[in-house]
A protein has these predicted regions:
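Active-site loop of short-chain dehydrogenase/reductase
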Residues: 5-7, 54-56, 83-84, 128-142, ...
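Conserved glycine-rich cofactor-binding loop
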Residues: 14-16
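Conserved Rossmann-fold SDR core element
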Residues: 25, 85, 163, 173-187, ...
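Conserved glycine-rich Rossmann-like NAD(P)H-binding loop of the short-chain dehydrogenase/reductase
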Residues: 28-44
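Substrate-binding pocket helix/loop in short-chain dehydrogenase/reductase
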Residues: 98-99, 106-111, 201
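Catalytic loop of short-chain dehydrogenase/reductase
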Residues: 130, 136-174, 186-187, 240
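C-terminal substrate-recognition "lid" of short-chain dehydrogenase/reductases
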Residues: 213-236, 241-242
Length: 254
């Protein structure tokens, strides 16, 4: 038990990467508030697993496209689990669109969940922490903000905005609250990928491997335990953002 009594709020904490972070932090002594919107059943099941195994978890529900619901999330998390010192803005959507066909509602949903909600949560967390305590915010972004391409237009632009927000939050909330980010690469196949496509994507990484799920909770804990880091993004991506074997280089004399 490293941090018994210091709680963490994880948005989208019931599934995929969020679930792994909830499990890891709970296993290391952090009470966890597992946020969900539609995945309440999965969140309740996860909380039961954590509580059964000796941790402490509660579920807090919010629609992150609704500003009122989002703004109250920190206070409700504190009511559920007690004092919190960590917020992980992990909730995300990942719809495939492009500049030529994006739907305005899909655009709005991406920016609401990826930019407005983390900002409202950070605002509420700053009020909660005040000037006499310390806290950490970790925003889940994507390595592609360092290596953009035109696919997933609304997703990429909103995650790029969250990366800029991470840096400006770090400036605005210092010295009491540090704000950092994690940039995942290929971790789990998405609903559009076949196992073969996902394996091919991983094989294309310069390390020939992506992150394992436990790496995410470990990275959150590293950021918590290292008080000199703020305004940074750690890419857990197998080096995906460093890909360099592009057609303008391969087979060309320079």
């Amino acid at each position: 038990m490293l941090e018994s009594g210091i709680g963490a709020l994880i948005t989208g904490g019931a599934k995929r990467i969020g679930r792994s972070i909830s499990l890891d932090l709970a296993a290391h002594g952090f009470p966890v508030a597992i946020h969900s919107n539609d995945s309440v059943e999965e969140a309740e099941t996860l909380a039961q697993v954590i509580n059964r195994d000796g941790g402490f978890a509660r579920v807090v529900q919010a629609n992150l496209t609704d500003s009122v619901s989002t703004s109250s999330l920190v206070d409700r998390a504190v009511e559920a689990i007690g004092p919190i010192g960590i917020v992980v803005n992990n909730a995300s959507i990942f719809e495939n669109d492009s500049l030529t066909d994006f739907n305005p509602q899909v655009w709005d949903d991406h920016f609401a969940i990826h930019v407005k909600a983390p900002s409202l949560i950070a605002q509420a967390f700053a009020r909660y922490v005040g000037t006499d305590a310390e806290g950490l915010i970790v925003n889940m972004i994507d390595q592609r903000v360092w290596r953009p391409n035109p696919r997933f237009y609304s997703y990429t632009l909103s995650k790029a905005a969250l990366w800029m927000a991470t840096q400006t939050m770090a400036q605005a909330l210092a010295p009491n609250i540090r704000v950092n980010a994690i940039g995942p690469g290929p971790t789990l196949a998405n609903e559009r990928q076949s196992p073969e496509d996902f394996e091919k994507q991983v094989e294309g990484l310069i390390l020939r491997r992506g992150p394992d799920l436990p790496h995410f909770g470990a990275t959150v804990r590293y950021l918590w335990e290292t008080p000199s880091i703020t305004g940074q993004m750690i890419a857990l991506d197998g080096g995906q953002h460093l890909a360099w074997e592009t057609p303008d280089i391969i087979g060309m004399a320079e």
